[in-house]
Structure formats: C-alpha cells, structure tokens
Amino acid sequence: MKKVLNFHFSYIYTYFITITTNYKYGDTEKIFRKFRSYIYNHDKNSHVFSIKETTKNSNGLHYHILVFTNKKLDYSRVHKHMPSHSDIRIELVPKSISDIKNVYKYMLKTKKDIKMS
C-alpha cells in the first residue's frame, strides 16, 4: 500500500480503470496488453499497477488497473485505440488518502482495513 500511496501523491493523475470484454469477440489479456502499451506511449514516466480477476459467476476475466501519470488521459482517444468490443471504464481517483485506500481495497477484494506502512 505504501508504494501505491507514494505513486498516488507523486503523479498528477491517478486513474482507476476496469477492462472487460465480450469473450465472443475478444481476448481480455490482449486488450490489457494493448492498453498498457498505449499508456506507456502516452506518458513514458507513467506507472501501471494491475490485478487480473476471474469471476466465477460468468467465467469472465477482467482487469482492475491503477494508472499513475502526469498527463491527462483523453477518454475518447483511449477508446478509439482499443477494439470496439472492449469495455473500458475509466475513473479519476481524487487526491485523498481515503479514496486511494478504498480503490486499492476494492481491487484486492478485501474487507480488512488497509495499513499505510
């Protein structure tokens, strides 16, 4: 958590992103790799922290991603570079300790309070 907190306050923007796909048309892992490549081309100094999750209900695979960057993401440009069947949700995380802790906690799917050290 300490590293995530450091990145959150060291970079201008922190985005919480979820990537899912319709398996009929695409591979979530390929889309994640393409997205990660897009982010690093967008800002070479950015940092990506991701968690891959498989849901048992629908046998679906999706990614929860934190992107730390000094350049603002243009949502429409991101979507333009991704396949049309991919579902990418992008949210800006406010610059507060409680907000980043809640996002991180959600990503880890834990009910426990997260320590800062």
UniProtKB/Swiss-Prot annotation:
UniProt entry tagged with the keyword Transmembrane helix: yes
Compartments where located: Host membrane
Stored InterPro entries: ORF117-like_Rudivir, ORF2/G2P_dom
Top-level taxon of the source organism: Viruses
Keyword Membrane: yes
Membrane topology of this protein: Single-pass membrane protein
GO terms for cellular component: host cell membrane; membrane
Pfam families hit by this protein: 117-like_vir (PF21578), REP_ORF2-G2P (PF23343)
Membrane-spanning residues: 4-26
Keywords of this entry: Host membrane, Membrane, Transmembrane, Transmembrane helix
Name of protein: Uncharacterized protein 117
